[in-house]
Amino acid sequence: MAEYITHSREETIALGRKLAAMLPDGALIAFTGGLGAGKTAFCEGLAEGLGCTDPVSSPTFAIVNYYRGPRPLAHFDLYRISTENDLCAAGFYDYLDQGAIVAAEWSENFADLLAPEDPIHINIDRVDDTTRRITIEGVSV
């Protein structure tokens, strides 16, 4: 496990870009952290690092935002998903099978289902208005 401290949104995005270079195709990233912690900002960096050019936004209402690029990213918000059937209907496993990088916010809601996929775990804690403590397990950045 590695811990990083970022002092701005830009530094959080940069860490996401750096992680993107380390990810194998079909990687699953399981995010935890409170509202406004910076999960979507981190995913913005992931998307940039994967070569996706569309603007990144929170998938809260859409459940999943898919970003095309040389290495595609499927960005899920699992907060409102309540069953495994809902997870499957949203295309979660299809994206993994296609080799997309899958970033799942609120992954703690499905920890048991995600465990067989051997996810990379990222927790983001809000220290203050600009500072974040980011812990990453499962890959070195």
Question: Regions from the language model: what does each represent?
Answer:
Residues 32-34:
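P-loop (Walker A) phosphate-binding loop of NTP-binding proteins
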Residues 20-26:
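Phosphate-binding P-loop
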Residues 1-18:
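N-terminal pre-Walker A segment at the start of P-loop NTPase domains
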Residues 39:
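Conserved lysine of the Walker
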Residues 52-67:
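Short beta-strand-centered segment that lines the nucleotide-binding/catalytic pocket of NTP-utilizing
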Residues 2-3, 48, 82-85, 93-141:
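Short phosphate-coordinating micro-motif centered on Lys-Gly-acidic
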Residues 28-30:
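Short hydrophobic/aromatic beta-strand immediately N-terminal to the Walker A/P-loop
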